[in-house]
Amino acid sequence: MIKLADLICRTFGPEEGQNHGYPGHQEIELALVRLYRVTKDKKYLEQAKYFLDIRGTGENYFLEERKQANFKRIFPEFEDYDPSYSQSHKPVRQQKTAEGHAVRAVYMYSAMADVAEEYQDKELMQACVNLWENITQKRMYVTGGIGSSGFLERFTTDYDLPNDCNYSETCASIGMALFSLRMANITQDSRYIEVVEQELYNNILAGIAQDGKSFFYVNPLEIKPQQCMPHTSRAHVKSRRQKWFGVACCPPNIARTLASLGQYIYGVDGTSIYTHLYIGNQTDIPVNNNVVQITMDSMFPWEGNIKVKVQGVKENIKLYLRIPGYAENFRLYCDGKEQELVENNGYAILELCKDSKISIQFEMPVEFLHANCKVSADIGKVVIKRGPIVYCLEEIDNGSDLQCIYLNNKEVQKKKSTDFSECLELELQGKRLISPDEGLYSSVAVSYTHLRAHETELHL
């Protein structure tokens, strides 16, 4: 690995005889930072910074490359090349909106956060904040999906979020989770973990079947199976998970993410341990010269009752416990005594000087969310959500033509699923729109028939 990294450092750089270019698909920057953190050899960190600093400056490297006599076009997207596709349209510190290929973008933003942290680069860090806010406030689906265009798998414009032809690649959501996790660990602000959780419990987990044998590459919010036709604008949309793909980045990326969940659950800063996610686990966490053992018992996200046992405490530590934005009546107990909440950036702070047993309780009411009216695709539509889970109305429970279903009240019944372990299903009352005949257009208004709509959970 070091030999390959050294080859990259020799080949690319600002010196005479070196290639003054940068990656077409950003990711090596992340690897170089990680190699620096393992080896402490600063040349790898400097190389990552070089790739970021030169990107989008001067003559565009990819456009100049096309002028070379021996240039060969390999990828069709480079035929009519738009520099924003690879985020090389501006210097990275000047970029304020998420542009181009979604996976490339968030992997680059993750590297920007890493480099900003290592160099204490406030300008680069502010660019990360600007880009993260643009995505989460104007260019991200409620499931955490990013990349609203199937063509070039890219971001488009603010509030352009179609539901039935978007891309929302699984890898893009993994990249967004990586970016958000880095921002959380740098700032200790729980708003970034809200997005990590949104990605993990929705767009990422939806990308893999319960048996782990089939996958979604793209994750639209609305699928009409008969419209998933080849050679159309929905050719990329699949109504069923696929066994494998020609470009098979998503399946192993999901596996890698699930295998590395520990990095998402906890963060450490000095003598402070941050509990980001309430996923049942048992782990050893180094704190200074000590090792703290934490055991968490949890039925989250179906129940808001979490028990945490902390052992091996030999010096004062602070345990930061995230208060989810959707949680109501958050209560904290330590060794049987209810604690007065001391909050900071969305975390409840608990100071421990000895081994302790902690209990966390909160309620997760069903929420009905509405998109900003600038999202034209969502006018007249509602999202049903409980905790981090966005629920999905499916044909197997409610018949076809789901777009005809109308919810006329917010009374929700919760029940245990008979198909998916401890998952909760939601049941609501609603109506179905019925056209007067099979004609395409009519001057007669549609009528309603009563419908009992069963909400089913995503495949988690």
What does each model-identified segment do?
Residues 450-460:
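Single conserved hydrophobic/aromatic residue that forms the stacking wall/gate
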Residues 1-2, 36-49, 56, 116-129, ...:
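Structural helix-adjacent loops and short alpha-helical linkers that scaffold large soluble proteins
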